[in-house]
């Protein structure tokens, strides 16, 4: 074990390290990610998302046409880089300037500095509302919404209240021939069955396609089990 995170009953916590550098890199295929630990437990990457990167990467490659992807609450850009490396043009939106800078550094480390990626520091809800007014459309939408957050101008996000209306909003910027819609959840109240219900209600009932929702996790080498890490809901034509 290289490090252990100790939670505090006052919120947050502290890392205890064992022969671990302050920063390091990790590779997934051709993608390179810069990692460092933070007091809120994150290290800059959710590796369990690799199963989703593989899924939508194949869909983008097999589309045999230009694909525009919108990545919302995009964090340090794992999904952005996976989509761009598969050939998509990507719009990356996150409310944190620091996270967008980190994502750009990951793109540079992955040799994707010149990839067609648009980097935006913005409130995701307000951005989608503006895209509706502009008439912009996307073939794929990916989102990894936090349980709670604030936009760059103090906008409050509470996932239990906001997520279903936000999915409804996002369906208005899907293209006439959409390819995929992915939503990830690390919130206890948004389990696979809930994600499936929302995607079936807002997408399948209106434009067809199919939905798959399941838990995602990381394999544990010491016991052969899978450590649950969250849930994903996928829609595809």
Language-model segments: which ranges?
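Conserved SAM-binding motif I beta-strand of class I
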Residues: 89-94
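C-terminal catalytic and target-recognition region of SAM-dependent MTase-like enzymes
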Residues: 178-237
